Amino acid sequence: MNLYDVIKKPVITEGSMAQYEAGKYVFEVDTRAHKLLIKQAVEAAFEGVKVANVNTINVKPKAKRVGRYTGFTNKTKKAIVTLTADSKAIELFGAEEE
């Protein structure tokens, strides 16, 4: 698996923004990715970033209904990435203007 295919997108929610201020970043990742691969992908995608810890969560599919038809959403995997104290911060929203 290519390192640049591991991270799909950042998760932007109220809970993830609370963790963002504590130095933890939440990403949606490929369901086949393991913790070491996620760590390597984050360090390759963001220059100057050192990962201290990776926690993963498997999100189960939810039942959804459209009229009388029932289906399920896709299963996903989330990764909570903690950076070391001497690491650069990840800019999720681009550079700040002065």
UniProtKB/Swiss-Prot annotation:
Domain of life: Bacteria
Keywords: Ribonucleoprotein, Ribosomal protein, RNA-binding, rRNA-binding
Disulfide bonds: none
GO biological process entries: translation
GO MF, one annotated term: structural constituent of ribosome
GO cellular component: ribonucleoprotein complex; ribosome
Pfam families: Ribosomal_L23
Record PROSITE patterns: RIBOSOMAL_L23
Family statement drawn from the similarity comment of this UniProt entry: Belongs to the universal ribosomal protein uL23 family.
Function: One of the early assembly proteins it binds 23S rRNA. One of the proteins that surrounds the polypeptide exit tunnel on the outside of the ribosome. Forms the main docking site for trigger factor binding to the ribosome.
Record's subunit section: Part of the 50S ribosomal subunit. Contacts protein L29, and trigger factor when it is bound to the ribosome.
Name of the protein: Large ribosomal subunit protein uL23
Organism: Streptococcus sanguinis (strain SK36)
